[in-house]
């Protein structure tokens, strides 16, 4: 049996018994839902009060991942912002791998990726940066409190590519 990271003891041995968990019954010719004729207008945001730079790097030999040269420490606040303000975050991937950058609590707009304007305005919580790319994000800080930002690849996050944002 393959080593499954400690899970082997909890898994049944022998042939599996498939079980039906759900029956889904749908009409043969479903009616399409109507789409709105126009999208909701996008709110006008105040001018950004600060531009921050976050640099994503990695040390593959040590299997460590960094933001601004540091691995995650839950006791450290990496960024401090003010509620009801808007910031620009420039997130640069100096590593050799793609990194999907994720921010909790505060949806953002992608202004550009790789120097090219983003093709449409939308609220996002993840933007993927290929090796060498820079993403410019417009980040409204609406809620007070602590939250995190990190690479959305769990192995990268667990090995250090995460930081703490505190909004006061």
Protein language model regions, located:
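Extracytoplasmic beta-sandwich strand-turn segments characteristic of Greek-key/jelly-roll folds
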Residues: 48, 68-81, 105-144
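Short, hydrophobic/aromatic beta-strand segments
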Residues: 99-103
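Extended terminal and domain-junction accessory segments
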Residues: 1-98, 140-146, 150-168
């Amino acid at each position: 049996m393959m080593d499954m990271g400690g899970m082997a003891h909890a898994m049944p041995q022998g042939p599996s018994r498939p079980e039906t968990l759900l029956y889904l019954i749908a009409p043969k010719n479903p009616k399409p839902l109507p789409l709105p004729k126009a999208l909701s207008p996008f709110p006008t945001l105040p001018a950004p009060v600060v531009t921050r730079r976050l640099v994503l790097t990695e040390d593959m030999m040590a299997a460590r991942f960094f933001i601004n040269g540091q691995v995650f420490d839950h006791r450290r606040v990496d960024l401090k912002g003010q509620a009801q303000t808007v910031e620009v975050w420039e997130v640069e991937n100096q590593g050799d791998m793609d990194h999907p950058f994720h921010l909790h609590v505060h949806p953002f707009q992608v202004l550009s990726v790789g120097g090219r304007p983003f093709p449409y305005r939308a609220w996002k919580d993840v933007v993927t940066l290929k090796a060498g790319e820079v993403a410019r994000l417009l980040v409204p800080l609406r809620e007070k409190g602590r939250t995190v930002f990190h690479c959305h690849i769990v192995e990268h996050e667990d090995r250090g590519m995460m930081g703490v944002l505190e909004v006061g």
